[in-house]
Amino acid sequence: VSNQKQKVVVTGIGAITALGKSAEELWHAVLQGTHGIHQVESIVMDGYMASIAGEVKQPLEELQAAQAFKTNDRAISFALRAAEEALQTAGLQQLPEDSGCVIGTCLGGFKSWERWIEQKQAGEQGEGEAGLWRQVRFNGIAETVGSYVGIHGPVVTISTACAAGGNAIGHAADLIRSGKASVVLAGGADALSIVAVSGFHSLQSLSSEPCKPYSGDRDGLSLGEGAGILVLESEQHAAARGARIYAEVLEFGLSADGYHPTAPHPEGEGAARAIAMALNKSGVQPDAVDYINGHGTGTPKNDSAETMAIKRALGEDAANRTKVSSTKSMIGHLLGAAGAVEGIVTVLALHHQHIPPTANYTKPDPECDLDYTPNAAVQQNLTYAISNNFAFGGNNCCVVFQAYEPSASSKQEVEADSTDTTAASLQRERVVITGIAQISAAGTKISSLWDAIAVNDSNAANSLWTEALDANHNRTVVSKLTDYDSTQYISRKESRRMDTLGKLTVSVAMDALKDSELEVTEHNCNQVGVIFGTANGTMESLEQFYFPVLSEGAPAANPAHFPNTVFNQAAGQVAMHTGARGVSSTVVDGHASFSSALCMAYQHIQNKDAEAIVAIAADVLTPYVISGYKDSGLLLPYEAEGAVAPPVDQHGFVLGEGAVAVVVESLSHALARNATIYAEVSGYGRTFEASQVNAADSSFRKGSDYQAGLNSTGREEAGALTQSNRTAVAELATRSGLERAMLQALQGDCSEGEVESEDIVPDAIFIAQPAIDAAEPAEREAIEHVFADTPMLATCKHVIGEVQGAASGFQLLTALLSMQQGYLPQVHGSAVSLAEDVSLNHILVNGASLTGSYTSILLSKYE
């Protein structure tokens, strides 16, 4: 491993599974080969092909953290319990200001969503609805954990189905190496739900017996539930406080199959690339791998494909010498939490120098012919171990761990307070934007969006708004698609089993690649990635799949709809339709999801994981999505018959749907192919403000509540930026929320670039707030705390509304066009007018999740 990289170590672990309420109980049980797959008690399993699962038997009311936070969502409760234990084992009494949290989940708040839907369909209305809707949010688990433990740095939710937990660990390590955090809680959480049980039942994937991974008589998987959280730290931070270190996290690899919505590539091609990428980045030779914690689900196709992948990545000889085992044989498949809990088992295997077994193994299979450590643990000297996770949508993830050996210079570095090993001192790729695309109420062309924005009268833009019905058949003002035709991009045959979200995502990705003039070929396809962001994801498919099950039971579970219920399916469709099979991930960060996707893409480009990445965000409107926002009190009231232009003094916003995509590349790659460059991404900031997690119903309507996240109690000490006076990074602790995000973006990562971001004061800032009238008391004040001379404020939300997870993407697109055209849709109080002939060299684009997460991205004109 390069000695220039900051080491990332594991100092704390926490888990709650079918084998107990702690990581210690988990480890002792798996060493014995004990499984916890028994009759399910928390949900009714009548009519399904299996009635067993790896269910957590611990009553939720006994979980201290869940009680303290007043949540009744199982997944959130599991995550809180695991986080509590992880911090206890890490011995961390107080987290540093830049601490982060990255959580992987496949199901998010599905249990709460099921209850909320049942209430809606029964016509029940009460004060609990807003609380349930907040628990439905996929980013709710990470933000609740962040709030509970006191996180102020980046809070990220990854939803790459069954690969999410491993992806979360890898991304958390990247945040530490890049200097964005010194401590990160990383892991995953999921709870059993009728959606998951009926879905896997519809695919005929469940076994009626405890699953038998890799065994010749395997016939399906066993579902599970729980959570796993690891505390990751920079080695320097851990050494400085004398922390116990369990293991080191080396690197991780991501890839997309681009093959099929549910089935793995039969030869494990994509999975092999993820394994090879992780090993190559780690500097670990394939024959040095001592142990593989396998994906091992117990389904015939998955296990044989993984066996092929291991052989392809390691080579036949090395693969035959390496021990493999499946933790799922003992706890079931924890879906988005699988990689997290299995990562903990891998870490403990290295720490204790024991390889846990594959339980329930009865007979060999010619297609699974490796050493699967059947039924009994093995003591062995271990240096390197990997954890594999592969998922629906063709997402593949591999994380490499190493038995910890202190760096020879770690003590001296701590004593000298050295920062030479941080990523800021490394040579990194500059990142540029070379392609853009959008689909919205304004149309499907970039010119259509700009034409609507360029109207020099904010009232005229309301002509794009129309009406839609919520779940109670009440009319609502929305911004919806009108002239989008998916057959212009996708054949009718191909689109039959795709939902609207998938079609939108594929279409906008195709347009962005076309605009960038980047052709994806067999030669470069593994170097072109896809990072997808969404706030509400697959709600359309969830409704189509779950409603018949709710009324008719197991026989109504439709296998055509179930694959589209996972949030990463859209990114998988992009890989299949464009051939972009490089790094692939899906991030959920509320209305800042596009910004989070772009930040992640930026990191991968800088790490040289890809030459180009399509960063996308998309969301669609359904009656139940509209009702969810209404329950939270976020939307503009529908005032009058046919009213589609609400008065400016109303509080709330107009909800929209649409998609946005940008192609980001390394500067060297863009120059080599003579690409047109729209702008450079010079830096980004991601922060979290815990006070906003349970204030979604007021955070964008009342300055007093939003103030907690946007404004600082310590601004007098911090001071404001001027061209000649730069606030010290150490003073970020006196800031809050969006202020810290903007300052981090301006700090940048410009050691190798021409842009000296410490001297930058942006010419304009595209605001995060959906309601223009709220910019004065809230976001404007936060901006004034950072900048002595307030930059121009701008927005396009008066045109297309608040497009959920794509909201910050449309702001960024408009910022690029403004920089190109020299015109700016400038905010004046509660109105927007076009400022002409403006010089725009640097623009900040702010984003907010609505519930505590903030992003700020610095765009600089490329010259």
Model-found features: residue ranges?
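Glycine-/small-residue-rich "gating" segment that lines the acyl/pantetheine channel
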Residues: 123-129, 170, 174, 191-241, ...
